[in-house]
Amino acid sequence: MMKELIAMFMTLCCSLVLSSCNIPSARRRFFTYPMKEILNDTFSEFIHHLNQHDAQAMLAMFSASAGEEQPLLLDEVDAMIAHFPDPVTITEAASGIGQSSSTTNGENRTKGIGNFSIESNGVRYYVFLSICTEDSANKEEVGIIELSIISVDNYHDSTLFGGDPERKKGINILE
């Protein structure tokens, strides 16, 4: 009985300490914006722009460094619009969520990854999304870093997760 009371007291104390946390980034990360919601919102917005064939809005969602590493990012966005002339629907929300947060020399960085399933014109696709939500040392890194897509028929584990040499920052249509 005493152990249970101590455990309840410790849980209450930890909850109070965390809820009174004065560090906005800690509060944001742990209480307001779970990575799954951020990934789902980002991907939903991207698919909305894709369905509207709004290349500029899609391009604006990528980190500036993705554009620097892939100077033809606008061409990749146009290729994606051409690849999906019909409406795209999200058939599976973010799964396989990963998040990394780090602080180096007082600089904070938070990245997230997730997998989605979409469908267009009767064809199903898997999508890998990598985003940066915070980088106080390099603001240009914030945004979509990589979006890789492959049809379910052509999928194998090494394509999206095995470091395919064809993948790069930006958009990768792996067909």
Say what each PLM segment does.
Residues P34, Q70-M80, Y125-I131, I144-L147:
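Generic hydrophobic, helix-prone segments enriched in Leu/Val/Ile
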Residues C13, L50, D135-A137:
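Structural motif
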Residues C21-Q52:
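Short, low-complexity N-terminal intrinsically disordered segments enriched in polar/charged residues
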Residues N22-S25, Q56-I118:
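Short solvent-exposed beta->alpha transition segments
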Residues Q99-E175:
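Exposed beta-sheet edge and beta->alpha loop/turn motif
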Residues M1-S19:
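Sec-dependent bacterial lipoprotein signal peptides
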